[in-house]
Amino acid sequence: MKPVSSRFLSMLIVDPQAFGVEREERERLEKAGRLERERTERERMERERMERDQVERDRAEQDRAEQELLFRRLKPVETGYHRNLRCMDGTRESLLNQIVNWVANKSEQDKVLQRNTYWLYGSPGIGKTSLSHSICEKLHERNHLAGAFFCRRDDPNLSEPINILPIFIHKLAIIFPPFRAIVAKLLRDDPNLTPESMKGSLFIDFIHSVPCHPEHTLVFVIDALDECGNNRSRPGLLKVLTDAAAQVPWLKIIITSRTEVDIQRFFENLTQSSYLPYDLATDQDADADLRTFARNQFDLLVSDWHLPTPWPEVGDFNRVITRANGLFIFISTLVLSLERCEDPEESLKTALQESAVTGLESLYELYSSILKAKIGHNNTEFQLVIRALLTTAPYRALCDETIAELAGVKLNLVKRWVDALGSLLYRDESANGGIRVRHLSIYDFFVSGRCDYQVNVRDADVQLGIACLKTMVTKLRFNICKLEDSRLANAEIDDLQSRIKEYISDSLQYSCLHWSDHLCVPPDNRDQQVLVLVLGRLKQFFEGLYPLFWVEVLGIMGMVPVGAQTLRRLISWVRVSTSPSCC
């Protein structure tokens, strides 16, 4: 037996090999623990990433569903600014900067007064629409643009005030998610809510319900409000928009228009501290901007025609500026007409030899000289064409073929005249080649007493309504699209659209939809012969099978509700027209 001291010493001495094994085991365990912790951390991070991704997917899906819901229920019309329609570079700069600063509340006065509505007004042709496109571009660059609506009298989608609020609600909902959530919830809760039933108070309620503010001030721009609605519908729309802008600090409204009585009266009744008015005729830079624009347009003409420079010479150039009197449309129309003549130099001299009127009178005189040069005087067939063109414009821009059919003139004449009058008319490719006037002042000119081809809108409506009835009597027939099975729903007919295009001409489509719009104008008890003629045409139409064929076409086009509206309008008109007070 070993002494106690030896046993104790052996306990203190560790076998080096055993010590190494123990250390390796400890390191192995530490490494395994570290790897386990790392694996756990990776799994945690992966779970969190997957949860975040799922949240993002859910949010994206919710956003997509809400956007689809808004688009489906609000049915916003297509409208917006176009960069190529803005003011020429170097013009309107001071005014544009002033508007941008107003949006950004850069002045102490703007911060204190919170005048959140800006009304820019001026005469026809002064450049309001180009200015609106430039304003939209500037605001878009700075993330301030919420939406824009460019009114047009010759486009039914852009001439109805009822279309403005839905598109603004839709635009704001797209760029401001908290607002979108509120609108989407209301649409889900009320399946009967439609764009037509939306009240202005509802828009204001939407605005008030937003729990937070957008990062930037947001602006709605409405251009050419005078081309939308009438003197009864516009004030209500203006009240909704100005009330909304006055009640929340982050929303501003910019409106451009002519000084129509109802619009001017509305703003005069507002307190001056709630809005900013701006008369474009008082713009201090207007003359310099007009000269810059005119010089640019003439220089392009000089380059295209290889004319001597400078042209026009200083005296003629100044006379052009004087005649324009601030109207950019005068310059653009003059240059367009010179582009289409055989001798621009001689044509400019002729144009400047006219009377010394300026502004709008000078513009109308220019329109007259263009018509005189291209059409001549007392052209009865052209009268029919321009009458059909202007009368159908509020409903749809029609192509050459349809105008020719409804006016009862040869197609080649319509084509030639539209080409010749390129400074006044154009074919809108976005509307299937529909013919439009280049500027609303051209429409005003044709319906004024200053035009040799003056259009009496009421008489033109009646004559076009009769032409629509004649078109339907001539072209309507049973099973017009030659369908094999009349029991099929429209959605079950694969080639329905191609059949419509092949068998239902554009003139027949237009006539079926709008004959009563033209025919049922307020009665004129001074012209009983016209009333007798109209009633006779209606009798011819309704005594045959044509009403059934008409309803068939409406059904194929998916426009059956138009039939009910038409008949209600017709019944009301017949009652009024045949009452003793009108006979």
Residue ranges of each PLM-predicted region?
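Extended HEAT/HEAT-like alpha-solenoid repeat tracts in very large eukaryotic scaffold/adaptor proteins
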Residues: 503-514, 518
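Secondary-structure edge/capping motif, primarily at the C-terminal ends of alpha-helices
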Residues: 106, 490, 519-526
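Short acidic-capped amphipathic helix/loop micro-motif used as an active-site/signal-coupling element
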Residues: 465-481
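Flexible, acidic glycine-rich loops studded with aromatic residues
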Residues: 507, 522-529, 536, 540, ...
